[in-house]
Amino acid sequence: MLAATDLARILDGRRIADDLLDALKTRVDARVAAGKLPPTLAVVLVGSDPASVVYVRNKRRAAEKVGIKAYDFDLPEATTEAELAALIDRLNADPKIHGVLIQLPLPGIPDAHRLIQRIDPRKDVDGFHPQNVGHLALREFGLRPCTPRGIVTLLGHTDRPVRGRNATIVGVSNHVGRPMGLELLMAGCTVTSCHKFTPPQMLEAAVRQADILIVAVGRPGVIPGEWVKPGAVVIDVGINRLDDGQLVGDVGFESAVKRASWITPVPGGVGPMTVATLMQNTLEAAEATDC
């Protein structure tokens, strides 16, 4: 247990992501030296949402750093679902494309999930396709959702065991919370998932007993830091911009850092790991075509 004067160690996602990207570059260089195609990633951006533009730029920069060739498909906001479906079909059929990334959200398209399902699961480097999530549920390793997989990598860089721990996940989105639960089950945790129907007193109790706390809600300070169990590992997936422009997470950082053993910063924690894991999935998708 931490003493009252101790502060959590910062789980530096930027540094860990950079180390992962360096390792991936070594593998890509070896692949190219062996006469194989470099991994390729089709990046589809619809419209000009500022956040999406930033996310896509970060992904393209990471691809360049690793040696993955990115093909850019920047489409107007008026692009229809039928036009996107036709593009996905072309990318699925192109043997030179190893990974397909559709940046979400898609403006004007209410059912993006239908388009995600259209991506060839072998090229679904986001890991969102139901077939890939199903593999995870069956404890089969394939193209796993990037953010949960990146969080597992982060947990491996602490000095805290994962197997046998109590883990609480706050938020049950299809892209983070639900697959995160599967990842932690596979890692040997006892998992509690909390959501909008979880009574407040039950939510607080679940947070207070968590050795590993993962929060992915998208509401600043939704989890008071005072709830954090002393010595817990806290992974804050949320990134929220306040009226003054400050970026904050879903957990009250100032008080949580005095109780946790490890905690991710916002920004600079989970986000870089998501991007690095996308590159990891893209390389693995390319390697799977060599068999």
Curated annotation (Swiss-Prot):
GO terms for biological process: L-histidine biosynthetic process; methionine biosynthetic process; purine nucleotide biosynthetic process; tetrahydrofolate interconversion. Homodimer. It catalyses: (6R)-5,10-methylene-5,6,7,8-tetrahydrofolate + NADP(+) = (6R)-5,10-methenyltetrahydrofolate + NADPH; (6R)-5,10-methenyltetrahydrofolate + H2O = (6R)-10-formyltetrahydrofolate + H(+). This is Bifunctional protein FolD. Its EC number is 1.5.1.5, 3.5.4.9. Pathway: One-carbon metabolism; tetrahydrofolate interconversion. It comes from the Bacteria. One of its GO terms (molecular function) is methenyltetrahydrofolate cyclohydrolase activity. The keyword Oxidoreductase applies. The keyword Oxidoreductase applies. Keywords: Amino-acid biosynthesis, Histidine biosynthesis, Hydrolase, Methionine biosynthesis, Multifunctional enzyme, NADP, One-carbon metabolism, Oxidoreductase, Purine biosynthesis. Catalyzes the oxidation of 5,10-methylenetetrahydrofolate to 5,10-methenyltetrahydrofolate and then the hydrolysis of 5,10-methenyltetrahydrofolate to 10-formyltetrahydrofolate. Belongs to the tetrahydrofolate dehydrogenase/cyclohydrolase family. GO terms for cellular component: cytosol. NADP(+) binds at G171, V172, S173, I239.
